[in-house]
Amino acid sequence: ILQNKKDWLALSIRATKENESLELCNIQKAAFLPLYEKYRDEGNPYLRGVEDVANRLNSDYFRYFTIFLDGEIVGGVLYKCKGRTPFIENLEEGQYYLQRVYIKPEQQCKRIAQTAILLCEKEFPNAKCFLVDFPEDLMKNKRCYEQAGFVDTGKRLQEQPNLVLACFEKILT
């Protein structure tokens, strides 16, 4: 549990349980709907169902965390531990890809995502590097990741005409 001194909110994370899949799916859909409406990209998490969340819980390629604020589920964080990412052919030992972090829309912009990311990182004791990508025109995402210690790699990937992904990383020493 981490207390945000500014707002005095109790924030915690833990490994996601299967019975949380539906609630997390609903939060994910609500959080990613505006991005789907803007970009209309087929990879948007808004398009994924409850089975997608449940399947990732049972895979050694992923680690899923549930975010709690004052005991209530407010979001999720998904890390990829093995395999391909948009910017890396194959994750190496100690590299982790922050595939998505999402928060209930009414709880966004309260540093919950940033704090949850920092809490999740403690769950990877062998981590050398964390990677994340996001649409480069989303300034609130950029600020969130920068405040969590990520830096811009300068790499970009044109996913479709109106969607360019920016790659950020956090190297641990």
Segment roles from a protein language model:
Residues 29-54:
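Conserved GNAT-fold acetyl-CoA-binding loop/helix
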Residues 114-115, 137-154, 160:
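Conserved active-site alpha-helix within GNAT-family acetyltransferase domains
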Residues 123-136:
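Conserved GNAT acetyl-CoA-binding A-motif
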